[in-house]
């Protein structure tokens, strides 16, 4: 079954997560219209190869045209309009940047796959009694459901008792007025006095029964409000707080957050019960106005009951106003809470009280740093204005599940300029990527005579003015959400708390697993721990400061740990994603471990790891070989950076890599990917066939072109290159490269510099095993 069809069969909570994957940058309508074609393309490859991305993008436009023709035949005006608008947007946004749309689509497809896996796992675990976490959660939810049912039942029981009291009071009122009327009209003789006393006794008995029932109802109302308070505290302080914490974790790459639908149903049910109870308390006031007496419990307790129920309802409504989707730039979906000035970002708020009468009644206004203006000025932080559509009315039509929400899609930030370039205080102690800002959402609710001011805010965001600030800004978001669940601590980085390696390790692994199919292994994390903390045996519980993580340079390096790691993450996502997902890249491994595992392997065995000396991120391969005397040697090639991988895929580099031996013969030192996977089996499928790379010659051409192939070559010695069959210009480049190579990374055995050149495939090259 197609992936898109499987997704549409998921539960509502998963469909809401699916909805959150899509935005204007890649509309869900397009995913729906072209589902089979989209799933048939290799978007991951297109995201790493610009020429292929351009081809796929133009094919996408062609598919849109074909679909438009179908809608034209069906006279579907709405779909025609939407598809035309989508095509115009894609052309304006991605025509010059086709790799961006490829990355976005690849990311969406991968997230869809993860969503299906999560749903399948949850379905399997749902029936397993031996799964402790699932059992605890289910039991807790069942208890909450029981408490809510109990509240609803008590409300209904009170409703019946109120009717009984009202009937009894009407009888009492009628008999009392009748007796009074008869007493005024008749002479009070002996017989009449006896009858009157008898009727008075009956009235006293009725009043006693009425008083008992009133006291019972007042007591039950007080108990009901206490039960509501308990359920409300469980919902807001536990369930909703847990959801908000999970949202924080999901923002920094952790497991996806659960859907709000169930929580919305619980809160809505409680709110309905509270409003019904408030009406019952108002009914008590009506009863009091008809019949009152000395010691009336309604007079004594009704004002307090009214105050309690109103306070409960107000607090519930305020807690139910949440940010369902945190601020995020559509072009950087994997890094929410970082906003660049002048670039649109999106966010979504939701009211978890689903009252149809509130549809299109709540106007939401957005502002930034509403409550921290004075603090921001003291800290020297920048100030911003929100531009774009910063007001919107909540409605139930825009959400798939009919929730009361408002999505802001066209917000931007602009810095308020002042005389010193925007900083309110030149002596500010925080750098801009450590400044935290809050985006606030406000509205007013008028419901059943109550006016309630609602306000919620986003998690703290970092505002940047240049995309080069993204790495440090994202580090701030990671550190904040890793170490605190305080949603408003904008002064967090004035004295940032210390984290433990266990916390940092989990978050670092999330940075890979959230954007790829593979997190970090224990061995890879141990290597990273050594980079941060130095040699050790057990890093559990070791403390890591914010400065150590992000600001201080690593020992012997001119850059910090996070800058180095973030560039590797970017390298993986953009250039070697498929190889990483396959598990072919060992990545983080110490030199000692590298030598230990390779030295026992046959010559030609190699592994792939990340460069430790390249600030911009580099990947290299290390292999084992035997020298003339039979001694084992470990060799590493100079790391390949993003600039080189833009021109040739890493798989093609590995498949074509050669060493020029002393006799000027090209040989391949790479045979088996560790531990024993044949190179062709591992990387062959990621190399484009030569028939696609070299178009056939024009039959009418007098002299057909010779086919060429780009390969990477490492000369053993520059003096031995004079006999290599290549052009003088290529030879000069090779000589210059061999004499002037810089920035090489030392290895245990030796260091090799490689040159990529274009070799003619003619008879002179027959001795080269290509």
From Swiss-Prot:
Q: Please tell me in which tissues this protein is expressed.
A: Detected in lung, heart, oviduct, ovary, uterus and kidney (at protein level). Detected in ovary, oviduct, and at lower levels in uterus and lung.
Please give the Pfam families that the UniProt record associates with this protein. Answer: SH2, STAT_alpha, STAT_bind, STAT_int, STAT_linker
Phosphotyrosine is found on 640, 705
**Keyword presence, Transcription regulation:** yes
Which residue positions does Phosphoserine occur at?
727
As for subcellular location, the record says: Cytoplasm; Nucleus
**GO:BP terms for this protein?**
astrocyte differentiation; cell surface receptor signaling pathway via JAK-STAT; cellular response to leptin stimulus; defense response; eating behavior; energy homeostasis; eye photoreceptor cell differentiation; glucose homeostasis
Which residues does the record list as N6-acetyllysine (modified residue)? 49, 87, 601, 615, 631, 685, 707
Query: Which residues belong to any copy of the SH2 domain?
Result: 580-670
Q: Which GO terms describe its cellular component?
A: cytoplasm; nucleus; plasma membrane; RNA polymerase II transcription regulator complex
Phosphothreonine modification sites?
A: 714
For this protein, what post-translational modification is recorded in UniProt? Activated through tyrosine phosphorylation by BMX. Tyrosine phosphorylated in response to IL6, IL11, CNTF, LIF, KITLG/SCF, CSF1, EGF, PDGF, IFN-alpha and OSM. Activated KIT promotes phosphorylation on tyrosine residues and subsequent translocation to the nucleus. Tyrosine phosphorylated in response to constitutively activated FGFR1, FGFR2, FGFR3 and FGFR4. Phosphorylated on serine upon DNA damage, probably by ATM or ATR. Serine phosphorylation is important for the formation of stable DNA-binding STAT3 homodimers and maximal transcriptional activity. Acetylated on lysine residues by EP300/p300, promoting its activation. Acetylation at Lys-49 and Lys-87 by EP300/p300 promotes its activation. Acetylation at Lys-87 by EP300/p300 promotes its association with BRD2 and recruitment to chromatin. Deacetylated at Lys-49 and Lys-87 by HDAC1. Acetylation at Lys-685 by EP300/p300 promotes its homodimerization and activation. Deacetylated at Lys-685 by HDAC3. Acetylated on lysine residues by CREBBP. Deacetylation by LOXL3 leads to disrupt STAT3 dimerization and inhibit STAT3 transcription activity.
Subunit record text: Forms a homodimer or a heterodimer with a related family member (at least STAT1). Component of a promoter-binding complex composed of STAT3, NFATC3 and NFATC4; complex formation is enhanced by calcineurin. Interacts with IL31RA, NCOA1, PELP1, SIPAR, SOCS7, STATIP1 and TMF1. Interacts with IL23R in presence of IL23. Interacts (via SH2 domain) with NLK. Interacts with ARL2BP; the interaction is enhanced by LIF and JAK1 expression. Interacts with KPNA4 and KPNA5; KPNA4 may be the primary mediator of nuclear import.
Q: Which PANTHER family match?
A: SIGNAL TRANSDUCER AND ACTIVATOR OF TRANSCRIPTION (PTHR11801)
Q: Which family does it belong to?
A: Belongs to the transcription factor STAT family.
Other remarks on this protein: Involved in the gp130-mediated signaling pathway.
Question: What's the name of the protein?
Answer: Signal transducer and activator of transcription 3
Q: Which organism is it from?
A: Sus scrofa (Pig)
